[in-house]
A protein has these predicted regions:
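Residue-level recognition of single "structural anchor" positions
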Residues: 1-207
């Protein structure tokens, strides 16, 4: 484990210095540069946050910051709880929440999803109230095999996997900065190829 931590720190150090070499700036300046880019991303995604999803939508919660302990829905000591909403064949929306209880998630769901939309969730009890909240609610059970190919949350789970794989290289992100990194993951998932993302960033930054 100690060897793995040293390896991860070396990777993060290498990433920062490689970026600094490309930009011909000091490594600390490279870190500041990337923070400014993430701030721009966060600003523009916040402007679009009022977009309402409709049609088939997948909902799920995930825990960041290492191995989760404790019961789902009650938060997890030392972990960051993130709630995600994915419109199938569309974009993902994420938000950091205090916990995954129904009273925390339901207001986000009602604000972000059009009434009468089809929503897919796992069997977490926090989603029980969706049955009486104006949505067409389907639950999936990972322990069973379903014939209905539509009854899944593979899309949002794919996003979680991509986000965690991307964030792992930083070997720990402080809670204050985490939302900016999360929105970078959301941006990368939603906005096409790297070349398309670069074009969008240039437009947003006015360069």
């Amino acid at each position: 484990m100690r060897h793995r931590l040293r390896h991860d720190r070396h990777l993060a150090f290498a990433y920062r210095h490689a970026a600094a070499d490309i930009l011909a700036i000091h490594p600390n300046s490279a870190a500041l540069f990337y923070r400014k880019i993430r701030t721009v991303i966060n600003y523009h995604l916040a402007l679009a946050a009022d977009e309402v999803f409709e049609g088939p939508v997948e909902l799920d919660e995930s825990y960041f910051g290492g191995r989760r302990k404790g019961r789902r829905g009650r938060g997890a000591a030392g972990k960051v709880v993130v709630f995600g909403i994915l419109k199938r064949n569309g974009r993902v929306y994420t938000v950091v929440v205090d916990n995954a209880k129904s009273e925390t998630l339901l207001p986000v769901i009602k604000k972000k999803i059009m009434p009468d939309s089809i929503v897919y969730t796992d069997s977490l009890s926090s989603y029980d109230k969706l049955d009486t909240s104006g949505f067409i609610h389907y639950r999936i059970n990972h322990s069973k095999e379903f014939v209905d190919r539509q009854n899944h949350i593979n899309g949002i789970e794919n996003f979680w996997n991509q986000a965690k794989r991307f964030l792992r290289k930083y070997n720990g992100i402080d809670r204050k900065s985490f939302p900016l990194f999360l929105k970078e993951c959301e941006f990368r998932f939603n906005f096409g190829t790297p070349s398309q993302q670069l074009k969008i960033l240039r437009d947003w930054c006015g360069i």
